Amino acid sequence: IIFKAPLEEPANPTWAPNPAKAPWYFLGLQEMLVYFDPWMAGVVLPVFIIIGLVAIPYIDTNPKGNGYYTFSERKMAISCFMFGWLVLWIFLIIIGTFLRGPNWTFYGPFEYWDFHKVVAEANINLSEIIWIKMLGTTMPSNLIVREIFGIFVILAYFGISGAMITKKWGQDILEKTGKIRYYFFLFLVLFMATLPIKMYLRWLFTLKYIVALPEWELNL
């Protein structure tokens, strides 16, 4: 209601606005492009976020709360929905609307938008950190060997994290929902969590990709 999102004229190839921002309701997707490849940020993540939010009522079969609002009786369903809605969507829209300025540079809430601001960002892949910085050697020519550490991190995240969550918190949910619905729910939760995790890794360690396979157009 407050922020304008008009349907403007067709794009002019001879002129580009700076910052080139989508309407506010698409800025969440545009912000995802900072951290992921277009196929992941524009297709895979949004699809799984939507699937996860739609699947919540089918996974959580708790009959309590039908016809009335109660957080205490539907903690799992409401918490998952609010995480997907507020963290994975509204938070990204706020960043894109208020904190991204010219050249899609990050600005503070009251910082002046300087069109000539230059930010020295040296984003680096996990394979480069391990092979070049830590081991002091050149990058292997074999693609799988080069990215083996990143592949292990991805598999360990879904495998080990999933097992730890199941052991510590998931037994009760597993008994109530059954194996198929529980493991589908666990996969969706872990997959949705990859977005804030990747954002923090970029902010804290300037990490670009955990697995970088541009030869296969597969970067994670």
Identify the meaning behind each predicted range.
Residues I1-N66, T70-L220:
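Hydrophobic cores of alpha-helical transmembrane segments in multi-pass integral membrane proteins
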